[in-house]
Amino acid sequence: MKIHASSGFTALTEEHGFVAAYPQGTMDARGNTFFNVGYEFHKESKVDDVKFANELTSKLVKDLALDPDAVFSTGMSNGGDMSYFLASQPDPFVRSIAPVAGTMMVSGNESFVPKKRMSVMEVHGRDDTITRWNGDLKNRDSWGAYYGTEAVMRFWIDGFSLKKSEITRLKNIPSDRKQIQLHRWWTAIDDTEVLLYEILKGKHSWPDNLGRQEVSTAAEIWSFFDRHR
């Protein structure tokens, strides 16, 4: 997926006045570009994409006079995994993340506890066969063992002690009638929240919207980031 062309973020930058960067990953031996988040078949790779993302962000902040405390990350699939990877670093520079079809690898995260409070938004299809909802702890798909969606959410919910929760049934996605459930966890202490958009019968894709036909998924993500600046 060419996220810069199809996600809808570019139009939003013009409307709301923020900067969107679309970094390209390194090409692997299979001819596919990737961000190095610890997949099994990239275990010999020395690519440091955390350093790359940090340096890219620092340059944009300096050159464009941006707010260094208002840096966010989103992406789909490997890009979603990279968003989690950035957020799970010992000293993350991102303020909030919004992965689509993302996950966290088991290796290195067995006892994961977030080091920085931030809000997290995940969009995930229940029938995703690439980044499986229930994960792949036995590494059947050869990506490397990774956690299921609910387990990933639990890292952040428990790490931030978010005790309040609710589930809201949203309107169907008009284009294909898929149903969406929004899971939300939060606290009365601050504005930290974790959102999970569960797309029933959803596949491995970037949905057009999340139940509001007039609001794109990109616009929902921007709204999430905007209120957590």
Name every feature range the model reports, one short phrase each.
Residues 4-9, 103-112, 177-185:
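Alpha-helical scaffolding within the catalytic cores
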Residues 213-229:
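Catalytic active-site module of serine/aspartate enzymes centered on a nucleophile-bearing elbow/loop
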Residues 201-205:
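Histidine-bearing beta->alpha loop at or near hydrolase active sites
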Residues 122-124:
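Short beta-strand/loop motif that positions the catalytic acidic residue
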Residues 1-72, 76, 81-89, 114, ...:
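Serine-hydrolase catalytic machinery in alpha/beta-hydrolase-like enzymes
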